[in-house]
């Protein structure tokens, strides 16, 4: 393949995305009667969306199913019967289908000049792939934003990630022996996995069936018909898909559960049909390079098989599994434990199919009686210490089962009864209709119905109802369900430190933990299921050779003259500024101090702090004069956006009066504690007023001494246009006449439970060459959880213009670093985002050479030194270690680089993936470029773990999220007096602000080309 040109697209329409096989399913239970005592409930409409993987995750090969959607173990609900109904014809085995491309099914044609013909703007009709690329996108949002349509590419013109141009890198100052947490998976390429679609319907076909019922019905069919449906030969994703090593009968089955004292009679229809035959040979063809089609459906089917056994033996959280067995030191003693677990993925690699498994730790609430949990959690000696508000805050939203009935259905706590248990009465209705309703009490009902005497009568009941229907159950009859995560932010200081210690284990301990898990009976290689599918896991870690790259020479300053600094590998490539200064110190004459700690009793800003900071700035090479404005305020001011804006405007006005209209170059803000008002201050300063601010906490500043002030000075110097560190020999790959620009892009998505907030795009670009260490930033809001960057070409063009304005030269070469995309989204980056950039540039008569590199941090790959001599002083791999053999893609252009030194825990390498290269890098050249760039990060004196354009883009995207939260909070606070200001109301407000108001994210013109974000 000739570098710099696209490889020809496939004519068969096969894209690179993953097929989503999921469908319906999910859903809760809804009480038909008032349901006191946790009585039988009817099926409610499900809130969980089914569906297979749509490539929304980051990092490794995406898991096929959401483990959180797997049904719980079936409860007892009567013996039941299964009847076969009207067999349907079996679907003849089909060849493995090409999965629909992530962004490739949108149709259209390619653009003229960029790579073909003019782009086709989507019509008003919905594209079949809309749900693949837009998640929960309200139509009104797109209309209000008037968003630029996505560029579309004809299937025959689609481009794929480039192949590696050589056999990998060879340059190294030394070589080290490593182990990597990849385990080879052997399989028979002649084997097939049969994929079946499952549909389970209740008595009312339009109502969704809960996950509990899905698992219960599936298990019932299989256990009643073991010869036709062998459990050990099948794997179920808990929703719509069954994968089988043998052929299964197809058709519809009637599953009936007779009426019992606890449950009404129920019936279901279980329909199964074959949809595909997955050939493992297709995966072999792909890994050997004989086919460029990635059979993601085969990988996803194998992934479900690998997860089947641990899903039955362990606590499942998302795509991770955690042990039920804990050690004494993992119990926090207040109803919360730390559980060890793992997450694994299947990856095609150069050595074959690999199972990548990594260790993790999560805090869980213990599966125990609600009463005992409350006693432990609040440290009560008895329930007379009951405090309603505290209990509601802790319990609402948690799931429980009831222990007075055999049915172990999971129910959600929605609140507490207003009355205590002894005072609750209700109308008891005779289900047979023989007697009129009569008034009874909860206490009497449980004594007569279940023979249970209520002990704790002077506390409320739990309300387990749904859809406004109350379902009161005494707390002592409720048990917390296992696997409920306890937020680490809620842990006390000692518990948080202990959880961190368990999580950030040293490399040797992490390696032992991983080895133990891969070999465990309940691990991915345990059980008989994977063997029945012809899969076998080699339980020995993969040995691999790493190459350590030479650190670049750095340019610093000493007493006004340039000096060369050689980072010392024995000091983990770090350097210090004890007797040296920054490369180019800025001149700061007009600046201000805002002291929010003046009225604080503790953590006041020391009287000499500003003088000491000025002294440290001078020693670093900055010319820092005394502040022209010094104002004091209170921390309470930060809770009011109007007060913050008024205060900042007063700073501008005073500076202007004193120095002939000059605006303050910088505002130093002292705070005594962390406060949400920090977000509001940044939002107002950076979008409304155009002020550069530097905030700091007085406590750490006092304790940190001169080192803290030096770090603060580095940030300040970068923010006001200075240069902290540069490469002495610049970037050797490029020619003298080249003008090069680096661009970084990232998308910050809202939290999982936030269903409305926009996603925030950040695009940054360099403003100088060859130093390439000053960046401009742009912040853009786009529809909720949309990963594809809309208007990426316009953002890049705007940054190119900023580069031209700063240097007077237009870049002839651009390297784009994209963060936050998974392997399944490479198609989107290449055929939507890159094409948008090329078309936008071309319209402006601009055709630079472009290289696109993806940086992935959300993966599970870890490296471990084979001996002490192969590692650093902390037992991690040395800074500058690169791996581009065995565990990388069989032939695509990727590598792992651990550029930083891991001082705590186990170093996580960054996975770099070159998708497109018009600049013609060799493996050695691109690895050297990225490693050297990691030394130019402006905030510290050591190489960072992530290439700076991506690092900065991540910081800017997070800043955009802060803008959204701050503006939402201000919107809530401006409600009329008497409006709700509860926590729930505030949370709702934070989610309700859509992206109609683009001014929220629009940077002030004064800051568009300033590194305000560092």
Curated annotation (Swiss-Prot):
CDD domains, alphabetized: PAZ_argonaute_like, Piwi_ago-like
GO molecular function: mRNA binding; siRNA binding
Keywords, comma-separated and alphabetical: Plant defense, Repressor, Ribonucleoprotein, RNA-binding, RNA-mediated gene silencing, Transcription, Transcription regulation, Translation regulation
GO cellular component, one term: ribonucleoprotein complex
Ranges of residues in domain PAZ: 369-482
Positions of the Piwi domain: 666-965
Cited InterPro entries: ArgoL1, ArgoL2, Argonaute_N, PAZ_dom, PAZ_dom_sf, Piwi, Piwi_ago-like, RNaseH-like_sf
PANTHER family in the record: EUKARYOTIC TRANSLATION INITIATION FACTOR 2C
Subunit structure as annotated in this protein's UniProt entry: Interacts with NERD.
Role description: Involved in RNA-mediated post-transcriptional gene silencing (PTGS). Main component of the RNA-induced silencing complex (RISC) that binds to a short guide RNA such as microRNA (miRNA) or small interfering RNA (siRNA). RISC uses the mature miRNA or siRNA as a guide for slicer-directed cleavage of homologous mRNAs to repress gene expression. Associates mainly with siRNAs of 21 nucleotide in length and preferentially recruits small RNAs with a 5' terminal adenosine. Probably involved in antiviral RNA silencing. Associates with siRNA derived from cucumber mosaic virus (CMV).
Protein name, as recorded: Protein argonaute 2
